[in-house]
Amino acid sequence: MTKTVIYPGTFDPITYGHLDIIERSAVLFPQVLVAVASNPTKKPLFELAERVRLAEESVAHLPNVQVIGFSDLLANVVKERHITAIIRGMRTTMDFEYELQLAHLNRALTDGVESLFLPSTEKWSYVSSTIVREIYLHRGDVSQFVPPPVLTALMEKNR
C-alpha cells in the first residue's frame, strides 16, 4: 500500500505558504492528499468547490498530489482513506500550541495516526489566508502571496 499523507485546511484562499508545505511534502512522501475543508463556523471568501478548484490548479505541477473537498470530521477521512500521517504547517509557537492539541485529538480519533509538523520557510512565515483576505478586502495587492489561479479568481471576484 502506498503511504499517503493528508494536508488538511480551509485554504480560503490557498497561499504560497500552503503551496510551500505541499511541495515539500510531495518530496518527502509518495502521495499527498490536500484536503480542503468545509468549515461551517467560518464565512468563506470562496465556496468549497471553488477552493478545491483553486487548490487543484495551484498543485497541477505536482504529479503525486491530489485534492479533495470534505465536510466530514478529519479523523473519518483519515480512516476511510488509510492515511499514514497528517501534515500540518507551523509558523509560530502559537500555531504549535493549537496544532499540538489537534494532534493529540486526531491521534485518539484515528487509532494512532501521527501528525507531522513542517515549519514554514522564512519567506512565508508571516503569510496566512486570513492576512491575504484582509489585504484583499482592503483593496491591497496580494499577488506576492497567492498562486496565479487564486489571483485571477480574486480579480474576477472584485469586478
From Swiss-Prot:
EC identifiers of the protein:
2.7.7.3
Keyword Cytoplasm in record: yes
Q: Which residues bind substrate?
A: T10, K42, L74, R88
Which Gene3D superfamilies does UniProt cross-reference here? Answer: HUPs
Q: Where does ATP bind?
A: T10, F11, H18, G89, M90, R91, E99, W124, S125, Y126, V127, S128, S129, T130
The residues that cross the membrane are: none
Query: Which cofactor(s) are needed, names only?
Result: Mg(2+)
Q: In which domain of life is the source organism classified?
A: Bacteria
GO terms in the biological process aspect are: coenzyme A biosynthetic process
What is a GO molecular function of this protein?
A: ATP binding
Name the InterPro entries for this protein.
Cyt_trans-like, PPAT, Rossmann-like_a/b/a_fold
- Compartmental location: Cytoplasm
Annotated site (Transition state stabilizer): H18
Keyword Secreted: yes or no? no
Which reaction(s) does the protein catalyse, per the Swiss-Prot or TrEMBL entry? (R)-4'-phosphopantetheine + ATP + H(+) = 3'-dephospho-CoA + diphosphate
Q: Which UniProt keywords apply?
A: ATP-binding, Coenzyme A biosynthesis, Cytoplasm, Magnesium, Nucleotide-binding, Nucleotidyltransferase, Transferase
Q: In which pathway does it act?
A: Cofactor biosynthesis; coenzyme A biosynthesis; CoA from (R)-pantothenate: step 4/5
Q: Which GO terms describe its cellular component?
A: cytoplasm
In terms of Pfam families, this protein maps to: CTP_transf_like
Tell me which HAMAP family the record gives. PPAT_bact
Family to which this protein belongs: Belongs to the bacterial CoaD family.
Give the protein's biological function: Reversibly transfers an adenylyl group from ATP to 4'-phosphopantetheine, yielding dephospho-CoA (dPCoA) and pyrophosphate.
The annotated subunit structure for this chain is: Homohexamer.
Q: What is this protein called?
A: Phosphopantetheine adenylyltransferase
List the source organism: Mannheimia succiniciproducens (strain KCTC 0769BP / MBEL55E)
